[in-house]
């Protein structure tokens, strides 16, 4: 195995482990509330978690933009700029979290109305939301911190933070629910404590990672904070670039959110059974995404580093290696879904009517790996290169094609049209990004490449 492949695996594998911990935590929360009351508790956790998932998913630009700009600073070995990128991300992330807390009643009303929350679950959702919202500054700050660690070529720390955070969440929730008797408030409090714990642990690792840097150790914390605050606020051009990069990623994320929410909504309009079928089958995309996101994160870190170092040959070798690993993932997941797709459905549910209704649509999941792989890899490359305009334009075009195809084909193919439209969306993202990269991305290495 060559050096590039080793670097990719070194960065990708911890990220995959981090991603896998996410559903395990959700399963733990559902298991806890499943033993404290009726179905309203389970529904409240599901709705409350979805509210925060949507909020934080939309703001994922904080992690991605920070990762790209930090990795470029890493490639140039300009450590002062790397820490300034983090300072900007923390300023925006924590600031937005505070705004969320101030506007929590308005946010709750909008999200509950949008999700058609059942009246029986409303008081429980209210209790959960108004506790967990106090973790918004920590969560959004942690987005910036995790992006910074990835940009600094370290995915082991985000993995460690995710594992510790999840363990704290589980044990704190168990203590508050069964020890103190707080019910859903106990689960929410466990989540809140875990979020702030993860944020503080991340700050500790930042301090430890920078303590051998001259510009960091030559100053006291007060002097450093003032120096960063002054230089960060007065560097207007850097702020403009920071907002430009994150604006593009934000709008691109809205395109992805629109497609995913519409997919769920369109399935729901076909009835509860089809909604259950689509939810079940979509877990195959989710599982594939957990693995591919790991390679995308590796692409972010290495693309930015190699671009910062103006190493075009190394960049091309890295791209070829990423697609090599992507090809392996396609073969592996296609084989698993084709040979064991039905068994996977039985693993997820024992409802025979849902399983039977899923079988006619199971074939579409076989194409998820092939159609989705390029989009994941190019996302990582584009983020590392901060080629965010290309990400936005290609995602917007793919989204428009998704809706156009669905509404044209819906009268003829119904739910099949929805799945084909989704596969078309995945395919177009990868195809369009390929042509964008060919025309715009590689040419950037011929420039002076002085701007971070």
Regions found by a protein language model. Give the residues of each.
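Short alpha-helical transmembrane segments in multi-pass integral membrane proteins
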Residues: 1-15, 70-137, 179-246, 303-368, ...
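N-terminal transmembrane alpha-helices
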Residues: 3-36, 50-65, 69, 94-101, ...
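Transmembrane helical elements of multi-pass membrane transporters/channels
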Residues: 10-29, 131, 142, 151, ...
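Helix-terminus/linker motif at the lipid-water interface of multi-pass membrane proteins
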Residues: 24-43, 112-119, 175-182, 250, ...
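Interfacial/gating helices of multi-pass transporter permease domains
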Residues: 33-53, 119-124, 184-185, 237-245, ...
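Membrane-helix boundary and inter-helical linker elements of multi-pass secondary transporters
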Residues: 35, 72-75, 151, 180, ...
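Small-residue-rich hydrophobic transmembrane alpha-helices
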Residues: 42-102, 139-157, 277-335, 339, ...
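Short runs within selected transmembrane alpha-helices of multi-pass transporters and secretion channels
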Residues: 63, 131-151, 158-169, 187-203, ...
């Amino acid at each position: 195995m060559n050096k590039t492949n080793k670097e990719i695996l070194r960065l990708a594998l911890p990220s995959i482990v981090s991603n896998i911990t996410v559903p395990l935590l959700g399963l733990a929360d559902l298991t806890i509330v499943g033993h404290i009351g009726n179905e309203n508790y389970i529904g409240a956790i599901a709705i409350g978690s979805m509210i925060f998932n949507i909020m934080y998913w939309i703001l994922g630009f904080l992690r991605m933009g920070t990762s790209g700009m930090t990795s470029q600073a890493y490639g140039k070995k300009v450590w002062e700029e790397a820490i300034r990128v983090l300072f900007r991300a923390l300023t925006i992330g924590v600031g937005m979290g505070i705004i969320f807390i101030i506007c929590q009643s308005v946010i709750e009303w909008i999200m509950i109305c949008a999700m058609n929350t059942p009246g029986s679950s409303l008081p429980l959702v209210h209790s959960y939301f108004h506790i967990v919202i106090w973790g918004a500054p920590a969560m959004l700050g942690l987005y910036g911190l995790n992006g910074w660690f990835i940009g600094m070529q370290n995915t082991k720390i985000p993995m460690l933070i995710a594992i510790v955070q999840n363990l704290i969440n589980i044990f704190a929730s168990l203590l508050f629910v069964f020890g103190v008797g707080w019910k859903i408030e106990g689960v929410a409090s466990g989540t809140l404590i875990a979020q702030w714990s993860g944020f503080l642990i991340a700050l500790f690792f930042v301090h430890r990672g920078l303590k051998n840097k001259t510009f960091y150790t030559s100053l006291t914390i007060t002097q450093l904070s003032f120096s960063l605050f002054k230089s960060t606020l007065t560097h207007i051009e850097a702020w403009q670039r920071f907002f430009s990069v994150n604006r593009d990623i934000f709008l691109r994320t809205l395109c992805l959110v629109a497609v995913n929410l519409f997919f769920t909504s369109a399935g729901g309009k076909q009835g509860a059974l089809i909604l259950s079928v689509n939810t079940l089958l979509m877990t195959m995309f989710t599982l594939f995404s957990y693995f591919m996101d790991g390679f995308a994160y590796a692409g972010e870190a290495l693309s930015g580093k190699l671009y910062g170092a103006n190493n075009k040959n190394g960049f091309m070798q890295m791209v070829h290696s990423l697609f090599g690993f992507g090809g392996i993932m396609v073969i592996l997941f296609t084989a698993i879904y084709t040979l064991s797709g039905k068994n996977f459905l039985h693993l997820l549910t024992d409802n025979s009517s849902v399983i039977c209704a899923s079988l006619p649509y199971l074939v579409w999941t076989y194409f998820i790996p092939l159609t989705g792989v390029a989009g994941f890899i190019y996302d990582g490359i584009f983020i590392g290169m901060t080629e965010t305009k290309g990400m936005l334009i290609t995602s917007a075009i793919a989204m428009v094609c998704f809706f156009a195809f669905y509404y044209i084909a819906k009268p003829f193919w119904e739910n099949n049209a929805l799945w084909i439209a989704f596969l078309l969306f995945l395919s177009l993202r990868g195809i369009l990004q390929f042509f964008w990269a060919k025309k715009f991305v590689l040419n950037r290495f011929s420039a002076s490449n002085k701007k971070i």
